[in-house]
Amino acid sequence: QVIEPWLCTRATPFTDALCREAIPRGIAALKTLMEKECADSRDELAWVSLCGGLALANAGLGVVHGLAGPLGGLSDASHGALCGCLLPFGLELNESQVTNPALRQRFLDVRQWIAAGLGVSPDDAWQSLREWSQRSGLGNLRDLGVPREALEPAALAASSSSSMKANPVTLESEQLLEMLEAAWE
């Protein structure tokens, strides 16, 4: 919930200040917690969560949350698992549609933060995030119990959801469906 506000159309200096530090700290803390229990990392994630709540309330969200809402209503999958599963796919889809140089830089920032946290090249950030998530036990949409027949209604519902209003690029329901199908496989 700190990555989407960084990329949203309604990002402000206030939300940027919250997200700029929270994103890399959140990645590092989550990576540690997936390997071992660590009270300091739990404290970090609590701080990141606070920053995320403040940032999303002020900047909005995007495609990941736009799709997670309808999918949660059409399945028993948890909101957090849906967002975690969808994040690398949403980053990839959004970035592929960006033409604005300033927004391209924001995506590069996220690539660099993820790459640093996972110890990979920024060019490999989205794929590495997807692979790390799966190695850490977060499966694809199918593994989360999302029925394939829920994908199209979710894409249609998301295309007009309030969470999509601040997405950095306009996405059609067909693009959302393609993204969901990739995340389901």
Regions found by a protein language model. Name each.
Residues 1-59, 168:
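Carboxylate- and glycine-rich phosphate/diphosphate-binding segment that chelates Mg2+/Mn2+
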Residues 74-150:
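Gly/Pro-rich interdomain helix-loop hinge
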Residues 50-83, 161-166:
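Glycine-rich phosphate/pyrophosphate-binding beta-alpha loops
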Residues 38-42, 76-78, 174:
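Structural motif
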Residues 5-10, 33, 52, 74, ...:
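Alpha-helix C-capping/helix-to-loop hinge sites
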Residues 148-185:
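Short, amphipathic C-terminal "tail helix"
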Residues 1-4, 20-31, 46, 50, ...:
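Predominant activation on well-ordered alpha-helical scaffold segments within soluble catalytic domains
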